[in-house]
Amino acid sequence: MNTPDPWSSPEVQFCFAAANSSCPRKARPALVVCAMYLIMIGAIVMTMLGNMAVIISIAHFKQLHSPTNFLILSMATTDFLLSCVVMPFSMIRSIESCWYFGDLFCKVHSCCDIMLCTTSIFHLCFISVDRHYAVCDPLHYVTQITTRVVGVFLLISWSVPIFFAFGLVFSELNLIGAEDFVAAIDCTGLCVLIFNKLWGVLASFIAFFLPGTVMVGIYIHIFTVAQKHARQIGTGPRTKQALSESKMKATSKKESKATKTLSIVMGVFVLCWLPFFVLTITDPFIDFTTPEDLYNVFLWLGYFNSTFNPIIYGMFYPWFRKALRMIVTGTIFRSDSSTSSLHPAHP
């Protein structure tokens, strides 16, 4: 007697077997399904724990209560919410190719997806503004980047994506002109976010290309200024103080670390999000023929940016490494732990 291979593709199945209008469920070998669940659950857990560590560190330790760190705290909160509210449901949809949670929650999930991803990108943009003042105008940094200014940054970072996401999805402006395609694929268990040609371009511009261009421009300027400062130090007056060997080594190390950090920041950001937003623009122009699996790969690549954020903007800071050790070892539960000295106080 032949026994079915548990690792082979199953027969054609439907999301809701009892529904006549059910969407077909994508057939995948069980081994592939297991691998996808392991990878995506791992990404969700890493995103959740990494950003939770940043949130606890900044919220608990008083020495970290600075305007700059409030930006990082807010971004970590955004990425944490993404891992809790959006990614688990996207995981099931991506693997099972079915939506089991109803039409209303489909819209809410789509809104939260757009909102939180855009909010995270906006935070990255404003953090680049903060770093610009810190590196390019350090003498006036404290007076320029105040708690009030950061409050404005946070207000923009949250309010614009909220109004944009919920307004667009519930008004269905993104579907105008794509009604025939929507009707053709409509079935029970479907939850896809479709953009027409106009909103494919506008949404990508608002959520990625505008803040991304600002961010790239700022970091290029920061890099240029940092290199200029390094050359000025190297060609300055040959005084005993200016030519201090220890100072020159420290400066060289600092500039090298800054260059490395900026390269990683920009590389990860562009690598994670550029493919998805290019696809968002091009898909309506090729009659929505992008393969579903390719769309999911690019979507999750974008999600991974929220996984990497606490590593880039947290673990590169010595205060975070020390705070993380205190969290892991339980030292944080001491009554006086909130006043512990974490050096340096500012990133």
UniProtKB/Swiss-Prot annotation:
Pfam families: 7tm_1. The gene is Taar4. GO terms for cellular component: plasma membrane. The chain crosses the membrane at residues 38-58, 70-90, 111-129, 150-170, 198-218, 261-281, 297-317. Disruption phenotype: Mice lacking Taar4 show an absence of aversion to low concentrations of volatile amines and to the odor of predator urine. They display decreased sensitivity to 2-phenylethylamine. Residues 1-37, 91-110, 171-197, 282-296 are extracellular. It is found in: Cell membrane. Residues 59-69, 130-149, 219-260, 318-347 are cytoplasmic. Changing residue 273 to A: Abolished trace-amine receptor activity. This is Trace amine-associated receptor 4. InterPro entries: GPCR_Rhodpsn (IPR000276), GPCR_Rhodpsn_7TM (IPR017452), TAAR (IPR050569), TAAR_fam (IPR009132). Residues 175-188 are annotated as: Extracellular Loop 2 (ECL2). Specifically expressed in neurons of the olfactory epithelium, to discrete glomeruli predominantly localized to a confined bulb region. Present in the dorsal area of the main olfactory epithelium. Olfactory receptor specific for 2-phenylethylamine, a trace amine present at high concentration in the urine of carnivore species, playing a key role in fear and avoidance responses. 2-phenylethylamine acts as a kairomone in the chemical detection of carnivore odor and triggers fear in mice. This receptor is probably mediated by the G(s)-class of G-proteins which activate adenylate cyclase. Disulfide bonds join 23-187, 106-191. It comes from Mus musculus. GO terms for biological process: behavioral fear response; chemosensory behavior; sensory perception of chemical stimulus. It is a multi-pass membrane protein. Glycans are attached at residue 20. Belongs to the G-protein coupled receptor 1 family.
